[in-house]
Amino acid sequence: MSDNVQQQVDSVGSVTEKLQKTNISRPRKYIPPFARDKPSAGAAPAVGDDESVSSRGSSRSQTPSEFSSNYGGRREYNRGGHYGGGEGRQNNYRGGREGGYSNGGGYRNNRGFGQWRDGQHVIGARNTLLERQLFGAVADGTKVSTGINFEKYDDIPVEVSGGDIEPVNEFTSPPLNSHLLQNIKLSGYTQPTPVQKNSIPIVTSGRDLMACAQTGSGKTAGFLFPILSLAFDKGPAAVPVDQDAGMGYRPRKAYPTTLILAPTRELVCQIHEESRKFCYRSWVRPCAVYGGADIRAQIRQIDQGCDLLSATPGRLVDLIDRGRISLANIKFLVLDEADRMLDMGFEPQIRHIVEGADMTSVEERQTLMFSATFPRDIQLLARDFLKDYVFLSVGRVGSTSENITQKVVHVEDSEKRSYLLDILHTLPPEGLTLIFVETKRMADTLTDYLLNSNFPATSIHGDRTQRERERALELFRSGRTSIMVATAVASRGLDIPNVTHVINYDLPTDIDDYVHRIGRTGRAGNTGQAVAFFNRNNKGIAKELIELLQEANQECPSFLIAMARESSFGGNGRGGRYSGRGGRGGNAYGARDFRRPTNSSSGYSSGPSYSGYGGFESRTPHHGNTYNSGSAQSWW
């Protein structure tokens, strides 16, 4: 045995001696195959060198620019960027605190982002592919355009109370940042809507705002424009130093400066897409978090930078509890569709976010509330969240736009399918049609019926997965599927261009829901048509529906008037609901600033009497849209 071992040792020694004589040695660095034939001066550096592309385990410390926006965190992340440390640059955001930021280069520029460097806003390079994705090509039908009735917005009555601030009549610098104006122009905006004319100077002057405006009037841009303009001018805020950063493992935490809360996933995604347009080539990085999607993917997204965050309340609370998001740096808080969030039971989550988490105090931030309706309980809630705010009411809250031609027809439940097909056969091929039903089962059943009848249709409701809902919206927006059957999930806030027809297959029990449903058409000054199937099952909203039609100067069919009289016989039906919630009539807080006493039932303290959102003192009612079964073209 010892002889065999000695022979093996001798053989190994001889091989080693031969290798030394032939000058063959193990390479000290790994050289990739594609670089082995190149001169040594041009060889790719080995993995592990300072110049190399880092491996997965060290990528965060090697690419500080990837995580340069609004982050504090563990010490090992501070090697490339000054996160939460004393070496950060001086900035002038709300007092010019030091530290917290180091905006690197390549990553953001490659993705259409700029950077904040040495107190200056450095605009990123243009990205033509990203521009086409964000803003579309010329005459792109998937992008909303200004309608032919856009100029009529100037006739809409506007009430502003709580401040003497002059409105702006066009997009100019000042008050808006010059780079933001370029993105506004790329987006196709030519003139501000009434809500934008007033919200821009109010927010840029530093005031809180409660804004009531008709659906489709540009509320989203109404808060994005002034917020982003201030952000572009003042730069990022310093990240607070995490006192526990060095005590064991702690997850990386995002510190956004703007938080936008919305009730539904679809609305959050829509706000996020609008934010991407106006943040293009700037230092501001927008992110979105919402339920129904992979939270790990959303965490990876905010790990790459999060300055402007759009979120649903439930998912945001989850991420706050996980320690992934801090609200200690919030300068702007936006509550969009606030009444809807309370209707959906989000008040505990909203109060936890605003009052229970580490949110900045009401004195340290600007708070904005935007919605189409603001009932009394919402205005009372505003006292806890807003300070010395300006109340803005554009048009009569709870009404509909005269840009929408409304028609109510009497259809029994058993005849609805046949009646629907009659309508769809008369519609032009261009344009999109949105059909609202009350139940998820009916949405799927009606979609199958339309597909079997050779109509391209899809559906969206709460039982569909987030991926299915996003896919359905994509097909509908692009026009590949021109008909969408939806439940209430699509009735609020969604801005889908080119929706020319809305059909209420099932009428809702709440007149506000009807307002939001038909508001999916006739947006941004464009015209639209809305038809409602009405029968005895809907008599509870007959009276309010008549008021709505009269305010918008629409035709009221005789059967609807008779049904309203029948439902109100011996009582006031459901009309009493509005005396407490704030819709039409009485001292409806939804139409005026509840801080101001008034003797007027309209909610406006002065000025002439206006009719609905049309804003005209007198107007001849619409005629000629009575249905005639002998002529399909007489629908509109």
Swiss-Prot record:
It catalyses: ATP + H2O = ADP + phosphate + H(+). Keywords: ATP-binding, Cell cycle, Cell division, Cytoplasm, Helicase, Hydrolase, Initiation factor, Mitosis, Nucleotide-binding, Phosphoprotein, Protein biosynthesis, RNA-binding. Residues 1-100, 571-636 are annotated as: Disordered. The modification Phosphoserine is found at S52, S54, S55, S58, S59. It is found in: Cytoplasm. Interacts with chk1, which is required for cell cycle arrest following DNA damage. This is ATP-dependent RNA helicase ded1. It comes from Schizosaccharomyces pombe (strain 972 / ATCC 24843). The lineage of its organism: Eukaryota, Fungi, Dikarya, Ascomycota, Taphrinomycotina.
